[in-house]
Amino acid sequence: PEKETGNDVLYTSELAIGYDHPLSVVSLDLKRGEKLGILGGNGLGKSTFLKTIVGKIPALSGEYRFGTNVQIGYFDQQMAMYTSNKTVLDDFWDEYPNLTETEARNALGAFLFSGDDVFKNVNMLSGGEKVRLALCKILKTRPNVLVLDEPTNHMDIVGKETLESMLKDYKGTL
C-alpha cells in the first residue's frame, strides 16, 4: 500500500444485508493489518456483505463506516467473466497509460503473464487468467484494504499459489 490507514479500518454495527429481506446481521471492528476471512455456505450473504460495504448495494439497516485513509481494492467474482477485444497488455495500459512497456510487462509478469502472454486477446483468456489480470489491475492502484470475493474460483494451482504468496506478503488489511 502507498498510504497506511488509521488503526480503525471498518466498523459495522447491526448491519443488515440482503436484497429484499435480511440475509445476515453483521457487527465487526476490523483493525489495520488484520486479515478477515468470511466463511459459510451458498446463499448466506458473504458476497452480499462485501457488495454492501463497498457501496455496490445499500444496507437494509444498521451502519458501517471506514476509518481514515482507507483505499479499497475490490475484486468481484464476476470479474472472471470480463470481456475485451484488446490484448492483455493494451487492456492493462488502458488503466495505466503512463507506464512504460517494461513497467507494464513487469506488473503483468508478477501475475504470470510473461513473454507473448501479454499479446493474448482478453476474450481468449481462461477464467483464471482473467482473474489474474483483474487482480493485477487492482493491486497496481496500491490499495491499503483489499476486499476479495472468491478470487480463486477459476484459478489453477499455480495461480492460487501465486495469489497466496502475494496475500501473505500484503501489508494492508484484507
Language-model region placement:
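Conserved catalytic-core segments of large NTP-driven translation/proteostasis enzymes
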Residues: P1
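ABC ATP-binding cassette signature C-motif
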Residues: E4-L174
